[in-house]
Regions:
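Conserved short alpha-helical segments that host acidic/polar catalytic motifs at enzyme active sites
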Residues: 1-250, 254-255, 263, 269-299, ...
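Glycine-rich phosphate-binding loops that contact phosphosugars or nucleotide phosphates
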Residues: 296-389
């Protein structure tokens, strides 16, 4: 899954973006890149690399003198969907005139039709990606207002996106937007950060805002403004993240798998602390909006998850059947909405996602709600999409 990090403020964006991209490496990727915006309107600096973030970091040190300063920057780790994994197809992508740079997570389903229209207007394409059309569309729609140009471009897209945009014409502005792919905003004094996952920016701030689908963020170092695509102001809740950066780093272990295995006892203890009331023989699950009567009439449990969350769900299936005596099954979330699953009236669906933003699991949640299931989300991020829905 791709990763996004962006920064605007007085500090050097390179270090902030690179450290954020390193924290997103666990998600898997095949290439990485950054776009940097000088404060004086000079051309954007684009550096991309096939391979690891460490390879990108070395290229940046070789390409950019230490005396150079930048007002803003965006970075990306790519997992190839359209176009092979190489330096050209890596993000960021740049508009024809070089004024706009874009990083994008998601899939643009109508990119072929958009690409043909742009080619007829004289636009050339360097990459084989769907994402490059966004950069050219922004240039095509630009009439002096960066947010308006991004909004006009987004209205032409079909599919999913989480994007971040910078422009040499607006060195004091960073624009981000989401539809089906997460964007979180880090709220700080005199600077703004954005990312596709809170883990990328948690070492800088624990005060964040999760954008909703259809939101567009316009950020400067000292202000953030969130509107709809149609420029209607919207208000989003400020969320406090109560875990720290140590929980997402390897902490001396050789790899994350080994760390997770050894941390299981502490993780389980932390999970039940304050929730398991031994003296009363019951539990206190304040975050679960499901009353005891609804629980009592649950006749079947369906678990939907992906990856390692799916493996956790496999264990959960045995525990539900062993301790609760409730028939349970486990589903690959990626297949759930395509197989017309049978959801009976008293089915409880448990969706498991570490980030709370896993696209396939979120789609399974929405399918379960449509079919009348009682849906519970199990995730680590309180303000994530699955937690809210």
């Amino acid at each position: 899954m791709c990763g996004i990090v962006g920064y605007i403020g007085p500090r050097d964006p390179i270090d902030i973006i690179i450290s954020g991209l390193h924290r997103l490496e666990y998600r898997g990727y095949d290439s990485a890149g950054v776009a940097l915006c000088p404060p004086n309107g000079d051309p954007l600096v684009i550096v991309k690399a096939k391979g690891k973030v460490a390879d990108l970091e070395k290229l940046l040190k070789d390409a950019i003198p230490s005396t150079h300063t930048f007002a803003a920057g965006i970075g990306h780790t790519r997992w190839a969907t359209h176009g092979e994994p190489n330096q050209v197809n890596a993000h960021p992508h740049v508009s024809r005139n070089g004024d706009f740079a874009v990083v994008h997570n998601g899939i643009i389903e109508n990119y072929i039709a958009l690409k043909k229209k742009l080619e007829q207007k004289g636009y050339g394409f360097a990459s084989k990606t769907d994402s490059e059309v966004i950069a050219h569309l922004i240039e095509e729609c630009y009439e002096g207002n960066l947010r308006a140009a991004v909004a006009a471009a987004l209205e032409q897209l079909e599919g999913t996106y989480g994007i971040a945009v910078i422009s040499r014409r607006h060195p004091d502005t960073l624009v981000a937007a989401r539809k089906g792919s997460p964007i979180v905003v880090g709220v700080c004094e005199d600077e703004t950060l954005i990312a596709s996952d809170v883990s990328a920016i948690i070492n800088h701030t624990k005060q964040v805002i999760f954008l909703d689908d259809g939101d567009i963020l316009t950020a400067s170092p000292r202000s953030i403004d969130i509107t709809s695509v149609r420029n209607v102001p919207v208000s989003r809740e400020l969320t406090h993240i109560d875990w720290d950066v140590g929980q997402i780093e390897k902490a001396g272990y050789e790899h994350f798998m080994l760390k997770e295995i050894h941390e299981q006892p502490d993780s389980l203890a932390n999970s039940i602390r304050g929730r398991l009331l031994l003296d009363e023989g019951t539990t206190k699950l304040s975050g679960m909006q499901m009353d005891s009567a609804t629980m009592a009439r649950t006749e079947r449990i369906t678990i939907a998850a992906c990856g390692t969350s799916y493996y956790a769900g496999m264990v959960g299936k045995y525990l539900f059947e062993d301790f609760a005596g409730i028939p349970s099954d486990i589903q690959q979330a990626a297949e759930f909405r395509y197989r017309n699953p049978i959801i009976q009236p008293d089915t409880c669906m448990l969706a498991i996602s570490q980030s709370g933003e896993t696209a396939d699991t979120l789609a399974a949640v929405r399918e379960g709600l449509t079919k009348g299931a009682i849906v519970l989300g199990l995730c680590n991020v309180v303000g994530s999409t699955i937690a809210r829905e």
